[in-house]
Amino acid sequence: MWIADGWKDYEVIDCSDGEKLERWDKYTLLRPDPQVLWSTPKKNPAWNKLNGHYHRSNKGGGEWEFFSLPKQWTINYRDLTFNLKPFSFKHTGLFPEQAANWDWFSELIKNSPKKDIKVLNLFAYTGGATCAAAKAGATVTHVDASKGMVTWAKENAASSGLADAPIRWIVDDCVKFVEREIRRGNKYDAIIMDPPSSVSYTHLRAHETA
């Protein structure tokens, strides 16, 4: 198991009763987490000093309740800076556990004997992996179907000092983009792929190419 233990601006403070108490820089958020199956005493004072609480609805979805929380703020991981904006389905725009993967492939890129590493990041969301790969020296193609997410990823790149980095921003269906890249004969040294749960395994397998 890899542990994302390089964070200074993020930590899981506590968890109980299906919820996770987190610190995102100087702000404390409480969000639902289905993996928190236990009920333990909530002794940490941070439980009573929330800046944001996402309430899950019995009908699905839910809504945020804010307490002195800005609409947007930044969080740092090593030499990367990300813009956070709480939005639907309890999200903040970043999955901090992915930092373990960022560290892993960043070292591979830096230590590669090949100078120009080309990375394809599919379902790339707000660009955490894109920024990490670009900061390590790779040329990155960032693909996501959401224009809003690609715009957000560009903001993260700019905040991380990567506004002029060799990143190609693509708003497109990832599977269709890959099909076109195969027909074009374009190749990459590495592919990063973290599809949302709404993309079925069968759908992805149907588009596999050796």
Sequence positions of predicted segments:
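Single conserved hydrophobic/aromatic residue that forms the stacking wall/gate
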Residues: 203-210
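S-adenosyl-L-methionine
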Residues: 152-187
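Conserved alpha-helix/loop element of class I SAM-dependent methyltransferases that forms part
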Residues: 97-112
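Conserved SAM-binding motif I beta-strand of class I
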Residues: 139-144
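Non-catalytic substrate-recognition/targeting regions of SAM-dependent transferases
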Residues: 8-22, 29-96, 103
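Conserved class I S-adenosyl-L-methionine
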Residues: 116-122
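Conserved SAM-binding loop of SAM-dependent methyltransferases across substrates and taxa
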Residues: 126-137
